[in-house]
């Protein structure tokens, strides 16, 4: 790398960080986009980590190398103007990342992005330094974009990535990274709501730092209360946690998984009573029975009638039980149909909606009106100067000659 070659030329004198850093003016900095500023920050942190690993430090002569908490530099300007309130020999404009970030990235804006977080070091990638946001993005490069999955893989993943808490730092055993918990919170994802599997994963509540924080690993969303987190998990699709070892198909419910296994085992517990054929699933048996019943698979054991829907069969079975499905709330009588029930209820209410257009009589049932119009009222018929009067019995009661 060009930076390494530059640092190796330090035999004649001390190499300063300004030799490898790029300086922007205020006008140039304002023209940069947010993505360009983040890229510039990452490159600066990488150069800073490289100088730290090679032992190249800038500062007062014969002074010991700084600790992790401070870095000593000299400014690039001709006049070595110290930061206000700080010694000219030791500049600490930013306590989190060292003074060079305060000089280049403008101390006020840079400190506002820290939120009291520290740099994280990844040993697997050459001791590179990252802040909290970039470190978790870099961490996902080792373990994939979704480090916590809401299925059986999640339980195996949590067991494989053993997280040990010791003081401030935590060790990620899979990639050998040493880092600090994000915002003082060690997130250990629990299993999804409604998930069932043979191997259970204990749900470890996350540590709290100044307040409750609950996170969902799939969407990386954070919630203030555990109740809101549970509601969010119910909206997500359930993971398929039952996997068939024969064909690799996965199922979210154990019932579906058990029915599928009969395909491989050859079990057929459902038999047809007509032709003695057997089926592995009940739905297949019902579909087969339609060939025997003419599209009506639900049959009554009492009288042998078949129905297309199960609800019709239940209603029919109440007839054999001596009780109709429709019961009157006034007298307790039961009827086989809703029409008969409504006609019966008019007896209690006194309603007579059917009226005769000739004699203005009213009836509670339409068949009573039809009977009245046909036989109940007198009707005169002229036939050879005779009029016949028919009664309700249809017989000639009286014959009059005029």
Swiss-Prot record:
Q: Which domain of life is it from?
A: Eukaryota
* Gene Ontology terms, MF aspect: DNA-binding transcription factor activity, RNA polymerase II-specific; RNA polymerase II transcription regulatory region sequence-specific DNA binding; zinc ion binding
Keywords for this protein: Isopeptide bond, Metal-binding, Nucleus, Repeat, Ubl conjugation, Zinc, Zinc-finger
* Residue span(s) of domain KRAB: 15-91
InterPro entries named in the record: KRAB (IPR001909), KRAB_dom_sf (IPR036051), Znf_C2H2_sf (IPR036236), Znf_C2H2_type (IPR013087)
Cross-link Glycyl lysine isopeptide (Lys-Gly) (interchain with G-Cter in SUMO2) placement: 177, 200, 253, 366
Q: Please indicate if the UniProt record lists Cytoplasm as a keyword.
A: no
Subcellular location(s) per record: Nucleus
Q: Name one GO cellular component term.
A: nucleus
Which Gene3D superfamilies does the protein's record reference? 6.10.140.140, Classic Zinc Finger (3.30.160.60)
Q: Name one GO biological process term.
A: regulation of transcription by RNA polymerase II
Q: Note the zinc finger regions (C2H2-type) by start and end residue.
A: 92-114, 120-142, 242-264, 270-292, 298-320, 326-348, 354-383
**What job does this protein perform?**
May be involved in transcriptional regulation.
Q: Which family does it belong to?
A: Belongs to the krueppel C2H2-type zinc-finger protein family.
Report what the protein is called. Zinc finger protein 587B
Q: State the organism named in the record.
A: Homo sapiens
């Amino acid at each position: 790398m060009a930076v390494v070659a530059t640092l190796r030329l330090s035999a004649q004198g001390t190499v300063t960080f300004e030799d490898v850093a790029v300086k922007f003016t205020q006008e140039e900095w304002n023209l940069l986009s947010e993505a360009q500023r983040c890229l510039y920050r990452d490159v600066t942190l990488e150069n800073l980590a490289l100088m730290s690993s090679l032992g190249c430090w800038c500062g007062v002569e014969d002074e010991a190398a700084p600790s992790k908490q401070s870095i000593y530099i000299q400014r690039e300007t001709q006049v070595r103007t110290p930061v206000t309130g700080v010694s000219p020999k030791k500049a600490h404009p930013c306590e989190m990342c060292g003074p060079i970030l305060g000089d280049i990235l403008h101390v006020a804006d840079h400190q506002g992005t820290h939120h009291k977080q520290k740099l994280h070091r990844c040993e697997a990638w050459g001791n590179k330094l990252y802040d909290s946001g970039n470190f978790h993005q870099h961490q996902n490069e080792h373990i994939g974009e979704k480090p916590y999955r809401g299925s059986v893989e999640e339980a195996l993943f949590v067991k494989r990535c053993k997280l040990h808490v010791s003081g401030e730092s935590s060790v990620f055993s899979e990639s050998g990274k040493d880092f600090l918990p994000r915002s003082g919170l060690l997130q250990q994802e629990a299993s999804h709501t409604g998930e069932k599997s043979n191997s259970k994963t204990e749900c470890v509540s996350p540590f709290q730092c100044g307040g409750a924080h609950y996170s969902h690993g799939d969407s990386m969303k954070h919630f203030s209360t555990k109740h809101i987190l549970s509601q969010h998990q119910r909206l997500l699709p359930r993971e398929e946690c039952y996997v068939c070892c024969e064909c690799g198909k996965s199922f979210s419910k154990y019932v579906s998984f058990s029915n599928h296994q009969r395909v491989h085992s050859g079990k057929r517990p459902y038999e047809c009573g007509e032709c003695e054929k057997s089926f592995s699933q009940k739905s297949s048996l019902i579909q087969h029975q339609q060939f025997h019943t003419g599209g009506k698979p639900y049959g009554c054991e009492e009288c042998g009638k078949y129905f297309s829907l199960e609800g019709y069969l239940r209603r029919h079975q109440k007839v054999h039980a001596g009780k109709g499905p429709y019961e009157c709330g006034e007298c307790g009588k039961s009827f086989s149909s809703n029409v008969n029930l409504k006609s019966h209820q008019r007896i209690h209410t006194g309603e007579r909606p059917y009226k005769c257009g000739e004699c203005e009589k009213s009836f509670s049932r339409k068949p009573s009106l039809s009977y009245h119009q046909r036989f109940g009222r007198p009707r005169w018929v002229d036939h050879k100067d005779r009029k016949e009067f028919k009664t309700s019995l249809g017989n000639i009661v009286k014959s009059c000659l005029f």
